[in-house]
C-alpha cells in the first residue's frame, strides 16, 4: 500500500524528497505471533524478508510489522520514515486489538478505520 501510494503521489507531482511518512499504531513484533505459512509467503517474495521474523514457540515466529512497513517506505524512496511506537496489543486502553480480544476470550472486539485520499 505504502509503495503504491508514494508512486501515485509522485505521479501527481509530489517531490519524493518532501514526502514524510509515519507508521501509526500497529501490533509490535513481540506480540505478533505467526505460523510457518505466513513466513513462507514473505520469503517467497524476498528471502531477505527473514530479517523481519524472530523465532517464537515451536513452528511459530514473531513478525516485525512496523519494521517491515518502515523498510517498505525506505524502499519506495522515503528517507526518514518513523513509527509512533504504539502497540495496539499492549495499549488496549487506547487502541483496539482483535488479537488481544481473542486471547482474552472476549465476545467482541472494537474496530478501526482509516481513509487515505490523494
Please give the residue ranges for each predicted region.
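Active-site microenvironment for binding and transforming phosphate-containing groups
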Residues: 1-118
Amino acid at each position: 500500500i505504502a509503495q503504491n501510494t508514494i508512486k501515485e503521489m509522485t505521479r501527481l507531482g509530489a517531490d519524493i524528497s518532501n514526502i514524510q511518512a509515519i507508521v501509526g499504531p500497529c501490533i509490535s513484533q513481540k506480540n505478533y505471533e505467526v505460523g510457518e505459512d505466513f513466513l513462507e509467503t514473505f520469503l517467497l517474495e524476498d528471502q531477505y524478508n527473514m530479517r523481519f521474523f524472530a523465532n517464537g514457540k515451536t513452528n511459530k515466529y514473531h513478525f516485525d510489522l512496523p519494521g517491515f512497513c518502515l523498510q517498505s517506505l525506505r524502499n519506495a524512496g522515503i528517507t526518514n520514515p518513523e513509527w509512533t511506537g504504539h502497540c495496539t496489543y499492549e495499549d488496549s486502553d487506547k487502541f483496539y486489538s482483535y488479537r488481544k480480544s481473542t486471547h482474552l476470550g472476549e465476545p467482541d472486539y472494537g474496530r478501526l478505520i482509516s481513509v487515505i485520499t490523494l
